Amino acid sequence: MLGWCEAIARNPHRIPNTTRTPETSGDVADASQTSTLNEKSPGRSASRSSNISKASSPTTGTAPRSQSRLSVCPSTQDICRICHCEGDEESPLITPCRCTGTLRFVHQSCLHQWIKSSDTRCCELCKYDFIMETKLKPLRKWEKLQMTTSERRKIFCSVTFHVIAVTCVVWSLYVLIDRTAEEIKQGNDNGVLEWPFWTKLVVVAIGFTGGLVFMYVQCKVYVQLWRRLKAYNRVIFVQNCPDTANKLEKNFPCNVNTEIKDAVVVPVPQTGSNTLPTAEGAPPEVIPV
């Protein structure tokens, strides 16, 4: 017996299988099974971790959709077609032309500025002539016409050239007419007019005609500038188009009626009295004293 114990102490790995308890063997088997499962399923753990990370961050995929929906949803309020702003009490929206939809509304001030800059009195889309009340400002309150530097330079050069050209034409005509008159007097004395007289007469006629054409073209440009200046310094009040105003008045009561029909009346119970209503024709209750 003592020899067997000494052998076990010297070499414990050579213990027979019969001496081991079933509990220890079962624990070892469970540990081996768990280790093999962990080794065989690394992909499952990775997929589970990825699914958990996706579930923990749900806003990453839905945030752009909500933003796109907000940007796509149209506004139901009426806006100005020039500045794309809503109307208020100080600057209400008007319907000056026959355009429909979102293009029919415009601010009075925006339309006034557009008419002043474009110098037109009709809508550029439906070609409807605006119903306007115009009034010029006093000369003291007139403002300068808004022009670029190139336009101002062109106007200054054209005016200077026009003045010089008119002076030259007038002077040349005066000299030619004076010389022609002297030659006519000499021809009357001699009785014969020489060919230089007819040449000067043709030159005078051509110069006079060219001067008239040049003055007509330049005066036309000046008239256009004058009209622009007058249009810029006038007060304009545009009225609503009667056709669109009547349509809006017809649609307004229809909308009100539909809103009234859609409304639901909810009865509110009376909480002040806890007594129940008595039946009609029932005798009054007699309370004994």
From Swiss-Prot:
Any single Gene Ontology cellular-component annotation: endoplasmic reticulum membrane
Phenotype caused by lack of the gene: Shows increase in the cell surface expression or half-life of MHC class II. Null cells have accumulated MHC class II and CD86 at the cell surface and a low antigen-presenting ability for exogenous antigens, in conventional dendritic cells. Null cells have high antigen-presenting ability for exogenous antigens in B-cells. In addition, mice are insulin sensitive on both chow and high-fat diet.
EC number(s) recorded for this UniProt protein: 2.3.2.27
GO BP, one annotated term: protein polyubiquitination
ZnF locations on chain (RING-CH-type): 72-133
Keywords: Cytoplasmic vesicle, Endosome, Golgi apparatus, Immunity, Lysosome, Membrane, Metal-binding, Transferase, Transmembrane, Transmembrane helix, Ubl conjugation, Ubl conjugation pathway, Zinc, Zinc-finger
CDD domains per the UniProt record, alphabetical: RING_CH-C4HC3_MARCH1
SUPFAM superfamilies: RING/U-box
Bias (Low complexity) ranges: 43-58
Sequence segments annotated as region (Responsible for low stability): 1-66
Residues annotated to bind Zn(2+) 2: 97, 99, 123, 126
Recorded topology in the membrane: Multi-pass membrane protein
Family annotation (Pfam families): RINGv
Transmembrane feature ranges: 155-175, 197-217
Substitution effect: residue 225 to S: Partial loss of down-regulation of CD86 cell surface expression. Almost complete loss of down-regulation of CD86 cell surface expression
Main location per the UniProt record: membrane
Subunit details: Interacts with CD83; this interaction antagonizes MARCHF1-mediated MHC II and CD86 down-regulation.
Domain statement: The RING-CH-type zinc finger domain is required for E3 ligase activity.
Name of the protein this chain belongs to: E3 ubiquitin-protein ligase MARCHF1
Organism field: Mus musculus
